[in-house]
């Protein structure tokens, strides 16, 4: 799964409704940029081949890219209407430009059945949406979405430009009619006391002991599914966007984020149907603190989204030490 995190809060954001400079859309595998040096897995960038194929780790189709590419691409976002209002349909237009040439990027690798994954998260982390803009003929992506409430949001753009590396770019947005401040929008995350949640008749358990997530260390994130009524293991999860599950993991300050998927290989054979009852995601939490994990899965053609909140400790830190520090902390004056 993805461990590298690309954050570009300095990305250009244009909330003016102006037209973007048009590009020329081209077929994915035609006229590949000269920077393309191989085929890589978007989830495992170290998996590189000289010819098209699939990832030996997760089974994903490899896409043209440069495993040595480190430059962050430039993303420009515009909205129509210019002022984004809660409860009103808004058209988002997204244009991507090459970091070195400034030219419009029009070729993208398909990652989990889509060219672009667009996450909309409210600043207080109570709202979460996973959308997929469509690629227009002029090379820009377009999405229509209605925000449910006024406030501050962070928009995460997850895509794979042909000839580059995986990108995960964050862009802030404040709606019209929001009269609060940053402090009022700040989340107050607390680790879940129960790691079992219910959604659409499915009991979902995050099977991890408290204190097991350590900053800077790779960790398994195991999820177990049971039928809510019968208690029987769920074995009929459906593939949604090419995987049996999706997870967005986001730090409380929104500076660290990972878009992850479970391993899809079992004894060397790609699973095509009948997912469950257990999925294992892999993640590396870059720094300590509270994180929210949004898990998405599909069963009986119904897509469910469940949030979990977990604590990530510093290396050498334990929950007992953390509680002791809080008990002896000097009161604020």
Per-range role (PLM):
Residues 5-7, 11-333:
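Intrinsically disordered, low-complexity terminal tails/loops enriched in metal-binding residues
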